[in-house]
Amino acid sequence: MIIDLVKRPVITEKATRILEKNQYTFDVELSLTKPKIKALIEKAFKVEVVSVNTHRPPRRKRRLGTTQGYLPRYKRAIITLKRGFMIPLTPF
């Protein structure tokens, strides 16, 4: 399902700043490629995607008592939409 692959929108200071340029930021499944991300976003939100930029943030350590591990990996995608399209980020 699309919901499982596109995990959540990112609401950070930078993500809200680039909303003015019609760019949206999502955390997506690590195995997705740029063409797959583009197809998923266009299908899910019925918008036209101009470009997709991705990056993989560094792993973060998590500690619970004496046990140490890492948080699961993810990929962050910055989606640029065609002028006139928008994605609602509020819950329905």
UniProtKB/Swiss-Prot annotation:
It is found in: Plastid, Chloroplast. GO terms for biological process: translation. Coiled coil: none annotated. One of its GO terms (molecular function) is structural constituent of ribosome. Keywords: Chloroplast, Plastid, Ribonucleoprotein, Ribosomal protein, RNA-binding, rRNA-binding. SUPFAM superfamilies: Ribosomal proteins S24e, L23 and L15e. InterPro entries: Nucleotide-bd_a/b_plait_sf (IPR012677), Ribosomal_uL23-like (IPR013025), Ribosomal_uL23/eL15/eS24_sf (IPR012678), Ribosomal_uL23_CS (IPR001014). PROSITE patterns: RIBOSOMAL_L23. Pfam families: Ribosomal_L23. One of its GO terms (cellular component) is chloroplast. Binds to 23S rRNA. Belongs to the universal ribosomal protein uL23 family. Part of the 50S ribosomal subunit. HAMAP family: Ribosomal_uL23_B. This is Large ribosomal subunit protein uL23c. The gene is rpl23.
